[in-house]
């Protein structure tokens, strides 16, 4: 299942693209732009003015994460990165690739090797475009040779064409998943595009397969940037998690307050409520349970002498304990309620918590009644 937070971030990113399509031309998003093109999408070209280039030269690029508009006061800051060697992505048509289904003869392999030798000579003389031409002929002759694609990728790096290098490195790794040169070229290309985390991942694999000083030097440049981005991401993931917890707590309090208001309206805080039927008692019991209130059910009768003594006290206790629900049942007027509770004498005080009887006081025992109220009203 796709993470809901990631889906929300993607939706916001798409909305930003609708408002400003030029975001796609950020070097760090070249992989996404290539993917869109592979699906047949048309990426709008952005015409740069002379001032645009001046601004770019004057401004140090930085990693600018998207922030969640719903994250209250969380505003993500830019990550300070060393982008001194980041280049503009090359958006030329893909270079020629060989047909992997074509039959390769020994003669083809020999000719391809000859073209590679010419390319290496051209590289040593600094004639990189010529070297690319020779290597292109070589891959057409031997289209399943991983080393030929990886070598051409390394030359594309020398002429600052990271996207072309990535395409060749990908093909090289398709034919040889253990191609150190393929991982190295792709990692260096991604570093040129400012894709620091992906660059670090590829360079680490390359170093494990066949370490050299160039890989080590590149990792020293790439890893600090990748680490800063990862630390930044974790920081804001933690902050968002904290905000989620805060929102959940606010929502819980909001619901609790709503229940309190509902209970206050239904339970007449500070007053004694007379009950006349079992249905009325059930409604009040449910309301008290929903509001996590202690409920006291007082069974009385007009002919009961001790009840006449306890009733004023009961009303006074109701004003003192406004968060306790005080109910009163006249057993002669609501004998069905009294019968359902098996009341045999009055006054009787039943203590109810979460819909269940938890205690009882029988008789005009003022001290016991006050003690039980204090005990059970503070138990939750």
From Swiss-Prot:
Disulfide bonds join 304-307. Changing residue 304 to S: Loss of disulfide reductase activity. The modification N-acetylvaline is found at residue 2. Residues 49-115, 240-265 are annotated as: Disordered. Coiled coil: none annotated. Keywords: Acetylation, Chaperone, Disulfide bond, Electron transport, Redox-active center, Repeat, TPR repeat, Transport. Gene3D superfamilies: 6.10.250.3420, Glutaredoxin, Tetratricopeptide repeat domain. One of its GO terms (cellular component) is histone deacetylase complex. One of its GO terms (biological process) is protein complex oligomerization. The record marks 305-306 as: Contributes to redox potential value. PANTHER family: HSC70-INTERACTING PROTEIN (PTHR45883), TPR REPEAT-CONTAINING THIOREDOXIN TDX (PTHR45883:SF7). Belongs to the thioredoxin family. This is TPR repeat-containing thioredoxin TDX. It comes from Arabidopsis thaliana. The lineage of its organism: Eukaryota, Viridiplantae, Streptophyta, Embryophyta, Tracheophyta.
């Amino acid at each position: 299942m796709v993470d809901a937070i990631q889906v929300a971030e993607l939706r916001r990113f798409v909305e930003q693209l609708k408002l400003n399509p030029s975001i796609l031309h950020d070097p760090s998003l070249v992989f996404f732009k290539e993917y869109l093109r592979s699906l047949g999408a048309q990426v709008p070209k952005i015409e740069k003015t002379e001032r645009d280039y001046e601004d770019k030269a004057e401004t140090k690029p930085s990693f600018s994460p998207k922030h969640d508009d719903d994250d209250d006061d969380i505003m993500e800051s830019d990550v300070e990165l060393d982008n001194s060697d980041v280049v503009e992505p090359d958006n030329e048509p893909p270079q020629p690739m060989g047909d992997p289904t074509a039959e390769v003869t020994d003669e083809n392999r020999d000719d391809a090797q000859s073209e590679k030798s010419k390319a290496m000579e051209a590289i040593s003389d600094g004639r990189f475009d010529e070297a690319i031409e020779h290597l292109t002929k070589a891959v057409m002759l031997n289209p399943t040779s991983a080393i030929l694609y990886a070598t051409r990728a390394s030359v594309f790096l020398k002429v600052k064409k990271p996207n072309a290098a990535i395409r060749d490195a990908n093909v090289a790794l398709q034919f040889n998943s253990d191609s150190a040169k393929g991982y190295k070229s792709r990692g260096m290309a991604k570093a040129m595009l400012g894709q620091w985390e992906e660059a670090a991942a590829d360079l680490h694999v390359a170093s494990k397969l066949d370490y050299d000083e160039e890989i080590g030097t590149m990792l020293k440049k790439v890893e600090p940037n990748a680490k800063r981005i990862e630390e930044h991401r974790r920081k804001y993931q933690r902050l968002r998690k904290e905000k989620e917890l805060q929102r959940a707590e606010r929502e819980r309090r909001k619901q609790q307050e709503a229940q309190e208001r509902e209970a206050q309206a239904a339970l007449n805080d500070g007053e004694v409520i007379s009950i006349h039927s079992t249905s009325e008692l059930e409604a009040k019991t449910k309301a008290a349970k929903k509001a996590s209130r202690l409920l006291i059910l007082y069974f009385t009768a007009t002919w009961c002498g001790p009840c006449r003594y306890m009733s004023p006290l009961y009303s006074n206790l109701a004003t003192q304990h406004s968060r306790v629900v005080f109910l009163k049942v006249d057993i002669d007027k609501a004998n069905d309620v009294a019968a359902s509770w098996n009341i045999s004498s009055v006054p009787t005080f039943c203590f109810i918590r979460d819909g269940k009887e938890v205690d009882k006081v029988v008789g005009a025992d003022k001290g016991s009644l006050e003690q039980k109220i204090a005990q059970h009203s503070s138990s939750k």
